[in-house]
Amino acid sequence: CDDTCKDPSSWETEFPRCGGLHQSPINIVTRKVHVTNNLPPLIFIGYTDIINITVENKGHSAHFALPPSVRLTGGALPGYYRAAQFHFHWGGKGRPGSEHTIDGERFPMELHIVHIKEPYSSLAEAQHDRAGIALLAFLFEETTDNHPHLDTVIAALGLVQNNGSATVIPNFRLSDIIPPASDLHHYYRYVGSMTTPGCEHAVAWTVFHRTLSISSRQLDAIVKQCRFWTGLPMTDIYRPTQPLDDRIVYSTNSGTTPKSVIHLWNSFCLAVLLTSALTQ
Ligand SMILES: *[C@@H]1O[C@H](CO)[C@@H](O)[C@H](O)[C@H]1NC(C)=O
Ligand SMILES: [Zn+2]
C-alpha cells in the first residue's frame, strides 16, 4: 500500500507537496467569500447516459470508474475535462466525514467527481497544469428520507469489502445521484490540491451550495461496508482542513451567501484574477 493509508500528518515525509502551500480541503468561511458574477453554470456532458461502472476497493477508499464520455466544461473552467472516477469521504458511526467544512461545520459525507483536462490522459500528466484537474464536491446532509438512488452505491460497496476487490454496477446514471443541472448554478470556486498523496497542486475545486440528502440508515450502512488494506474498518476517510494561505474563495451570487455589491471594475478585476489563477 502507498502512503495514502498512513496518517495525513506523515504524508509530507514521502510527498513533500502535501506539506506545501495551497492544499485542500479547506474550511469555507461564507462571510469572507468573494461573490462574483463571473462564475457561469457548469455544463455536464454524458451525465445522463446509462453506463456500466466498475467499483474498486483501493485500500484507502473505493473508486467508481467513469468512462471518458462523461465530460465537463463551462463554469469558468479553461476547456473541456473528461471524468475519471468518483468516490466518497465519510466518517464513522455518528461522526461526520466531509473533507470541506462550511463555517467550521463538517457534513456527514462528501462526494468527489474527478475530471482530467483534455487532452491529458492521466493525473500524472495533468498535475503540471494548475487547472489540470476539475473536482466537483457535493456535501451530504442527513435527512429522514432515503436518497432514492444511493442504495445501488451502498450495495456495490458491500461487494468490495476488501482491498483490491471490484464489481460492476450495470445501468448506472450519474445524474441519478446528483441534483439536476438547473439546481447546480450556485457554487464556491477555489484553486487547491488533491486531498490524497501526492497532493498535486493542480485542482480547480467546485463545491456546490446545494447539498445532497442521505438518511441515517444509509449513512450507517455506508460507513460499515468496506475495510482498509490493513483489514480495519474503512472509517473517517477524510483529510483535515488545510490553511487557506493567500487564496481567495469565490462564490456565485446566491441567497445562501452574503450578497455584496460588486462594481463593474471589481468584477473585471475578479475575472482577470480568476482566469490567471486557473491558467497559470
Ligand atoms: C453493460 O453490460 C451489459 C452486460 O455485460 C451489456 O449487455 C450492456 O451492453 C452494457 N451496457 C453498456 C452501456 O455498455
Ligand atoms: Zn476525494
Regions found by a protein language model. Give the residues of each.
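Alpha-carbonic anhydrase
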Residues: 1-280
